[in-house]
């Protein structure tokens, strides 16, 4: 167990370092790899992916994958994470920033990330600067990527190599389900359980707002006095746009700021067939026999019609 935890921590550190080297991403919480630290398996029994625990807003994604693959073949699974590239999010320091994207792909056991020598030059060019890693040493069939710049990577391409049932007895020629998730933007909850500044914050008590001040860091300090004269102060993070002003009467839990969340997480599932080349050849041979039989029947019919015509003429 201790060895597995060490490798998970090491893999997490390397992923962060290489991703940061590839892209200068400012104060992002769009790390699918954060799930590696808190979840041994990112997919719960009910099918929910761990990423949805931090990215509370739902946004659609799309999956593009071949319907069937042959053993030892290399193919691509593409996760599309669309969003309006003109929109910006609030970074951790309250400044506007472009959205980042991340993705997770849960493949059937036996399927795994293709090696560099197996990846085509076209895919290498598309994935330049993108680091895809296995979820852990235990689950090399689960791949994660991110955070990466969303403007240039709304399509996440995962090069995958199919297993060979001849070499792996646990793999059969079957139809397998696989699962994908993709997020854009920062999450609303940190892995520690704390809320990020990508949230709508409610009043801690009802009453009148007697004062709103701005701190040196750009934070908004709101003072509320209730009907009993009790005073509370709330500090909202910099960059949040207030919905209230001094003198307003608010109820408890009433939103004090506009919801700044412009991102979200989505998950989808699909199927892929691991096909046997011998079965495909057998099917083609069967189709050829059917075609040949049909041709012979047509020729025989024409021959019979000629014989009948000759007898009538006679």
Curated annotation (Swiss-Prot):
Keyword Transport appears in the UniProt entry: yes
Transmembrane annotation, as ranges: 280-300
UniProt-recorded Gene Ontology molecular function terms: electron transfer activity; heme binding; iron ion binding
Subcellular location(s) of the protein: Plastid, Chloroplast thylakoid membrane
Residues annotated as binding heme: 31, 51, 54-55
Gene3D superfamilies from the UniProt entry: 2.40.50.100, Cytochrome f large domain, Single helix bin
Cofactor(s) this protein requires: heme
GO biological process, alphabetically ordered: photosynthesis
Segment forming the signal sequence: 1-30
Record membrane topology: Single-pass membrane protein
Principal cellular location given in the protein's record: plastid
Free-text remark on how the cofactor is bound: Binds 1 heme group covalently.
Keyword list, A-Z: Chloroplast, Electron transport, Heme, Iron, Membrane, Metal-binding, Photosynthesis, Plastid, Signal, Thylakoid, Transmembrane, Transmembrane helix, Transport
Subunit structure: The 4 large subunits of the cytochrome b6-f complex are cytochrome b6, subunit IV (17 kDa polypeptide, petD), cytochrome f and the Rieske protein, while the 4 small subunits are PetG, PetL, PetM and PetN. The complex functions as a dimer.
HAMAP family: Cytb6_f_cytF
PANTHER family linked: CYTOCHROME F, PTHR33288
Protein function: Component of the cytochrome b6-f complex, which mediates electron transfer between photosystem II (PSII) and photosystem I (PSI), cyclic electron flow around PSI, and state transitions.
Annotated family: Belongs to the cytochrome f family.
Protein name: Cytochrome f
The organism of origin for this protein: Thalassiosira pseudonana
